[in-house]
């Protein structure tokens, strides 16, 4: 297969209901680590309870998403890791180690248990976190304050459009590039293809021709989007169309070729390629 040339690194953190954070007087700029987030969750618990509500502080806690290390198996939840020296964690561990036998993992478990005991998590986090539809519904309706996410540029803007309230991303670590990220998406030609040469020619066109790339990702100009300058499109067509109802664009265009050879939606930051 031909790898999809997209954002290669990953960066984890929290998607936060920024409207609620502002209402509760929470300064998210103070959050740099998981430990810092304890005070945020405490405030959410106290103020939502005082208002007669029961807002869940955070969902989706995951050691492999909140702790940087190089996964040696390609599946970060499986044992087998290597420390990344730039982050300064996993002190004293060998070049290859079991991340679940580390002090870092013990500290993580202790912290999350404290959060659970203090009522910052769902009463049944295992089942709650596995039901993403329920999570998304609660986040949209103000019953969930935040959840852990592996961030991609533009994701917060897409979440805002979906929920109808402000959404901000609070990073927990600097972006990390792993070998597995480069293999995260690819276009392959079926062994049953009658015309594999033509299929490969199309994949090449998808990766090199801006018109074709934009067409496949965003649809037909004037019907599914409008052009904004030379490098952007507007999926709302000047605010006259709900992107969810435009009949084409479903926000996963990064799967097709390279987003860096396509026009970007205006919801993305202007410096998206630099990011």
Located regions from the model:
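Extracytoplasmic/secretory soluble proteins
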Residues: 1-275
């Amino acid at each position: 297969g031909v790898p999809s040339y997209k954002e290669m690194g990953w960066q984890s953190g929290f998607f936060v209901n920024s409207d609620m954070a502002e209402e509760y007087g929470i300064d998210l700029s103070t959050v740099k680590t998981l430990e810092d987030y304890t005070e945020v969750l405490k405030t959410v618990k106290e103020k939502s309870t005082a208002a007669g509500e029961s807002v869940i502080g955070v969902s989706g806690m995951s050691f492999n998403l909140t702790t940087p290390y190089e996964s040696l198996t390609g599946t970060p939840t499986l044992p087998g890791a290597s420390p990344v020296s730039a982050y300064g964690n996993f002190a004293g561990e060998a070049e290859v180690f079991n991340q679940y036998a580390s002090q870092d993992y013990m500290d993580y478990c202790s912290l999350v248990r404290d959060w659970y005991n203090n009522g910052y998590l769902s009463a049944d986090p295992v089942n709650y976190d596995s039901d993403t539809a329920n999570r998304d519904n609660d986040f949209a309706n103000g019953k969930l304050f935040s959840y852990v996410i592996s961030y991609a540029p533009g994701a917060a803007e897409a979440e805002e459009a979906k929920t109808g309230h402000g959404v901000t991303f609070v990073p927990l670590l600097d972006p990390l590039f792993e070998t597995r990220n480069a293999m995260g998406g690819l276009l392959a030609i079926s062994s049953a293809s009658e015309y594999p040469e033509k299929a490969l020619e199309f994949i090449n066109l998808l990766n090199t021709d801006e018109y074709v790339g934009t067409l496949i990702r965003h649809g037909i100009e004037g019907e599914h989007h409008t052009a904004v300058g030379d490098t952007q499109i507007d999926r709302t067509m000047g605010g006259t169309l709900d992107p969810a109802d435009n009949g084409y664009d479903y926000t996963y265009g990064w799967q097709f070729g390279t987003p860096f050879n396509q026009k970007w939606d205006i919801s993305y930051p202007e410096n998206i390629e630099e990011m």
